A protein has these predicted regions:
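Bacterial N-terminal signal peptides that target proteins for export
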Residues: 1-10
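Bacterial N-terminal signal peptides
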Residues: 9-20
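N-terminal module-boundary/linker segments of secreted carbohydrate-active enzymes
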Residues: 27-71, 308-321
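Loop/turn elements at helix/coil->beta-strand transitions in domains of secreted/extracellular proteins
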Residues: 37-40, 67-72, 127-132, 186-193, ...
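Active-site-proximal beta-strand/loop segments in catalytic clefts of secreted hydrolases
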Residues: 44-47, 74-80, 134-139, 195-200, ...
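Conserved SGNH/GDSL esterase-like catalytic core that processes O-acyl groups on lipids
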Residues: 49-167
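Substrate-gating cap/lid alpha-helix
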Residues: 199-250, 255-258
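Histidine-centered active-site loop/cap adjacent to the catalytic His
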Residues: 260-321
């Protein structure tokens, strides 16, 4: 893609976002304010999420503390049946649609502990977790199939499978995420934030699989929630955010106009791509896709700019019910 084409694409994306949200820009500015009192949030993750939360890494824990969110988390080995071990795309069906979902989610909503080290609010405000964040790790960005394959309907062979499954294909991945909306729709009293799977470094994937990952994550942001009736689901494009940097893996491009971003800026939600890359720009090494602290800090800044907008929009929608 040429530089001119990239610039045009970015303008079109911004125009689309502005069209969707521009009439509510003033309202969105109001929605950017922190909650009046602390809100409980639980984050389902593994090693990349741990690094993102950590003070030595992306400092997401500290960023959410500053926004008045009381953060707990799950990690390897957590919960009934050790369900915390299973966080690949196909596993989300087990958590939110499978026969033991009530057991898993009752434990999740009541979780209040830390399962890795990060800064958080000192006082637990009590009650169940209000927000559930969930994220699969970077191997889930190695996706087969074709970029424009539609979501699989009906029985999906990826249900309950790990990311090494032969069924890890675009249609099945999209189908899993569509399946989750059935549960989310049944719980308008909870908020669910999907963190898209982070990108792989170039040495850990190939162009076709990386392009499929880009297509899936664009679909999640633009199409997944079309027609969904509530405001209790959001998606943060962690993948896109980690595909551009400020010159090297230890320097980020947070706050820059150009680059690949998902953030709240100038009164609107921006999801833009001006850098033609489908690979991790912050890999710890040429074959290690764990993001550096610089990448994590960029993601923290951009996510922290969005969460209040999503949360307040959801709360406002509940008042209208």
């Amino acid at each position: 893609m040429t530089r001119h084409a990239l610039r045009s694409t970015a303008i079109l994306i911004l125009a689309a976002v502005a069209t969707a949200t521009g009439t509510a820009a003033a309202q969105d500015r109001d929605f950017a304010a922190p909650p009046a009192k602390p809100v409980k949030l639980v984050f389902i993750h593994h090693s990349t999420g741990e690094g993102w939360l950590a003070d030595w890494g992306g400092r997401l824990g500290a960023a959410l503390k500053a926004k008045k969110y009381f953060v707990s988390d799950t990690n390897y080995g957590w919960g009934p049946d050790g369900i915390g071990d299973r966080t690949d795309t196909g596993h989300w069906w087990l958590w939110f649609r499978g026969p033991k979902r009530t057991t898993y989610l009752n434990a999740l909503y009541k979780e209040y502990e830390q399962h890795c080290d990060y800064t958080r609010l000192a006082a637990d405000p009590g009650g169940e977790n209000t927000i559930v964040m969930f994220k699969s790790c970077f191997p889930n960005s190695h996706i087969g199939g074709k970029p424009n394959d539609p979501p699989k309907t009906g029985a999906n062979p990826l249900r309950g499978q790990d990311c090494g499954s032969a069924y890890m294909k675009v249609a099945n991945v999209k189908g899993i995420y569509k399946d989750l909306l059935v549960y989310f729709k049944s719980r308008p009293d909870k908020m669910f934030i999907l963190i898209s799977s982070p990108p792989l470094v170039k040495g850990a994937t190939d162009a076709a699989h990386a392009a499929n990952a880009r297509a899936v994550h664009n679909w999640l942001v633009k199409d997944w929630l079309k027609g969904y009736p509530h405001k209790n689901v959001a998606v943060f494009d962690f993948y896109n955010v980690l595909t551009s940097n400020g010159g090297n893996r230890n320097k980020n491009d947070v706050g820059q106009t150009a680059g690949n971003h998902h953030r709240f800026r100038n009164g609107i939600i921006q999801h833009i791509q001006t850098v033609a890359s489908n690979y991790c720009a912050y890999g710890a090494s040429g074959d290690d896709s764990h993001p550096t602290a610089a990448g994590g800090k960029k993601a923290s800044a951009e996510f922290a700019s969005l969460i209040n907008v999503w949360y307040n929009a959801w709360q406002a929608s509940l008042q209208k019910r």
